[in-house]
Swiss-Prot record:
PANTHER family: PELA, PTHR35882:SF1. The lineage of its organism: Bacteria, Thermotogati, Deinococcota, Deinococci, Deinococcales. It comes from the Bacteria. This is Uncharacterized protein DR_0705. It holds the Pfam family Glyco_hydro_114.
Length: 308
């Protein structure tokens, strides 16, 4: 799966052609739409009680995190840096986190050339853990996520997020193990990496929340469930953008989601759509399956408050 965050310097919305929705993929009965309350929550709920969430990874502008602070969402994922690449001060993080879970986005399975850790002269193969550049996402590079050198860099980013006061981390590119078919232990190494991240964070803050994005199937692997608190997933019902997913994909993902739910862990979904009927259908189907949906633009440069 592609990285969730486009380069701050090369941000663009992705789009695709529309196609008819696969037949037989929806529930027999559709529940009424759920309206997001338009007032900020007064008290942070238990993670398992979150019903509305959102994501904004850039486009903060002069109002900074104010849109998050005044939003009705009980959980919001933001980039740990402002639009200028400066880490959010702890005071701003505390203010935005009032009444909600404020979660920091980090790419733990890929390197980004626009991040502060990137060094001049780096290129594919130098350092050794830096692998191919993603042709669809300039500035994003596969990494040997099992390499201790990369892990040290990523954990330093995690330390900064914890120091800023975030409630948890939303980890992108956990499904990167799927790109290493020639490495027999790639899946187990990703599970070990996620659990290492969790142990590192919880040693500093036992309440720190670990939310991997995608790779929901890893819940089947021994030990993984104990390391994570919730699952975040892109494109369950709609590909970016406005392109319904196949019924087979939906069945496969929903089977994994049920295992998360049986383990008592919430499943957050994000769909990239701006056609009202498709937005409504995706959100309703997600809620009927016990999921917590968010529907937004692929650019993720603003919070979409008017959720279906």
């Amino acid at each position: 799966m592609k990285p969730l965050l486009c380069s701050l310097l090369l941000l663009s919305a992705c789009a695709g052609p529309s196609e008819p929705q696969a037949s037989g993929a929806g529930p027999a009965q559709t529940p009424p739409p759920v309206t997001v309350p338009m007032t900020p929550p007064s008290k942070k709920p238990a993670l398992s009680a979150v019903q509305h969430w959102g994501v904004q990874l850039t486009g903060y502008g002069q109002t900074r995190l104010n849109a998050v602070h005044t939003s009705p969402f009980e959980l919001v994922v933001v980039d740990p840096f402002d639009d200028d690449g400066t880490p959010w001060p702890a005071a701003e993080v505390r203010a935005a986190a009032q009444g909600r879970w404020l979660i920091a986005y980090l790419s733990m399975g890929a390197a980004e050339s626009y991040r502060s850790y990137w060094q001049k002269g780096w290129k594919v193969g130098a350092p050794a853990w830096l692998l191919n550049e993603d042709p669809d996402w300039p500035g994003n590079f596969d990494v040997a996520y099992w390499d201790p050198a990369w892990q040290a860099i990523a954990l330093a980013q995690l330390d900064r997020v914890i120091a800023q006061g975030f409630d948890g981390v939303y980890m992108d590119l956990i499904d990167a193990y799927q790109r290493h078919d020639n490495r027999p232990g790639a899946r187990a190494e990703m599970v070990a990496w996620v659990c290492k991240i969790a142990a590192h964070a919880r040693a500093q803050n036992p309440q720190f929340v670990i939310i991997p994005q995608n790779a929901a199937e890893l819940i089947r692997d021994p030990g993984y469930a104990a390391c994570v608190d919730a699952s975040g997933n892109e494109e369950t019902y709609v590909y970016a953008a406005n392109r319904p997913t196949e019924a087979a994909r939906q069945r496969e993902l929903l089977a994994s989601y049920r295992l998360w739910q049986q383990a008592g862990k919430p499943v957050f979904t994000i769909e990239y759509a701006n056609q009202p009927a498709l937005m409504k259908s995706a959100a309703e189907r997600a809620r009927a399956a016990g999921l917590i949906p968010y529907v937004g633009e692929r650019s993720l440069d603003k919070l979409i408050l008017n959720q279906p």
